[in-house]
């Protein structure tokens, strides 16, 4: 009995030591599902209207640490050619050298540098935004919509995570100054992201 007790205690001690030294689960990669994500920005046009445009093409991923969201990160690339206002002539103007200059700067990128958890579902995501060849730190006010399993029976089943975020940027900070201030310098941005572990589909 004494030998059994000592063996049990030794095993328990070793197990506790191993658990204490074990590394926490690493963040897992979730690919952005462009078909269910969107980035919309708007501006004031000479005081008369407030048009919007969107980016239809979104590439990137979320490194999601479900145990500690502050250890998560996000990386997004937007091909400027995917910009869509619904008006072909306006699309052409916004992609021209007067604005985004898509030929010279074909992508917009965002890479997070810090994630802070705010309350139950809130996040403050700080990162490097590169537009028009200029990189600036911006902060997104974000919220977690849902983390769980996305399933369409018989079609697919995959771990998924959804987020919404907003921010306001000054386009002049990125060297895009055409028509400022008649066309607003401050640009509100709304983001919704759906990210999935697509390799898990079945």
Specify the residue positions occupied by each region the protein language model found.
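Positively charged n-region of N-terminal signal peptides that target proteins for export
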Residues: 1-4
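Bacterial N-terminal signal peptides
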Residues: 7-16
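Low-complexity, acidic/polar, glycine-enriched regions of mature
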Residues: 19-202
């Amino acid at each position: 009995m004494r030998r059994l007790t000592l063996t049990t205690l030794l095993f328990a001690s070793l197990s506790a030591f191993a658990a204490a030294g074990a590394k926490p689960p690493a963040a897992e990669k979730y690919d952005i599902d462009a078909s269910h994500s969107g980035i919309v920005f708007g501006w004031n046009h000479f005081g008369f209207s407030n048009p919007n445009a969107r980016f239809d093409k979104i590439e990137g991923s979320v490194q999601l640490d479900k145990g500690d969201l502050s250890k998560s990160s996000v990386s997004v690339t937007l091909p400027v050619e995917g910009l869509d206002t619904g008006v072909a002539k306006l699309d052409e103007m916004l992609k021209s050298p007067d604005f985004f200059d898509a030929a010279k700067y074909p992508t917009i990128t965002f890479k997070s540098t810090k994630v802070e958890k705010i309350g139950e579902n809130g996040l403050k995501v700080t990162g490097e935004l590169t537009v028009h060849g200029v990189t600036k730190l911006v902060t997104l006010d974000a919220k977690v919509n849902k983390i769980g399993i996305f399933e369409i029976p018989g079609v697919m089943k995959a771990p998924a995570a959804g987020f919404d975020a907003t921010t306001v940027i000054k386009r002049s900070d990125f060297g895009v100054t055409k028509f400022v201030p008649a066309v607003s310098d401050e640009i509100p941005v709304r983001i919704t992201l759906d990210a999935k572990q697509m390799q898990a589909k079945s």
